[in-house]
């Protein structure tokens, strides 16, 4: 069976048993438009990967700051769950590796790299969702911690002896601690939300790339090729189709 290049909008494939399969033929973009689209897509991937790496650095830096904060009776329990979960460190690692791998995959588009980028993007999505949940709980717990801090200071301040012996911090220190933690949690939450959106976008791009670029489409076999054991493939003019000829 000799394949014919059909220029009309409808392509009809007739099999040896006489059954026809009509298919719609979509107009293919020109080479210039394809090259322009590829360049635009590569630029977008680079920008998203760079922002992912920046988010990773931000989350990691804020996590280090929280880990180095001295222990506080009322506020340590607020961010201890965040540190014990390991999100500022493990999540930042996923974000950074995902961004770096996206840059590498954009330069060298291979099937293993595309699948690895897709897997890291999915892990980044799950990690960002976990971090957003923990940070939301931590932000909600700041107000009760502030009230406990104020109450403890008020109780100590009513007793002069206790005031002189324990020398409690000024009441403003409770507000300063709450404001500082609110700022840290807010920056980390913004970075996590941004990372979530970017991870979803990159995962979608790599999923489409892995589905379209590495999958076969149509196989044409002649009737006398049933007893052949090997076939060879060659590309047609239309890159979305494959012509399988008997060797």
UniProtKB/Swiss-Prot annotation:
Indicate the transmembrane segments per the record.
47-67, 81-101, 122-142, 181-201
One Gene Ontology cellular component term attached to this UniProt record is: membrane
* Protein localization: Membrane
Chief subcellular location equals membrane
Query: In what tissue types does this protein appear?
Result: Expressed in thymus, spleen, intestine, colon, testis, heart, liver, brain, kidney, peripheral lymph node and bone marrow.
Cite the PANTHER family for this sequence: MEMBRANE-SPANNING 4-DOMAINS SUBFAMILY A MEMBER 6A (PTHR23320:SF135), MEMBRANE-SPANNING 4-DOMAINS SUBFAMILY A MS4A -RELATED (PTHR23320)
Q: Which family does it belong to?
A: Belongs to the MS4A family.
Q: What is this protein called?
A: Membrane-spanning 4-domains subfamily A member 6D
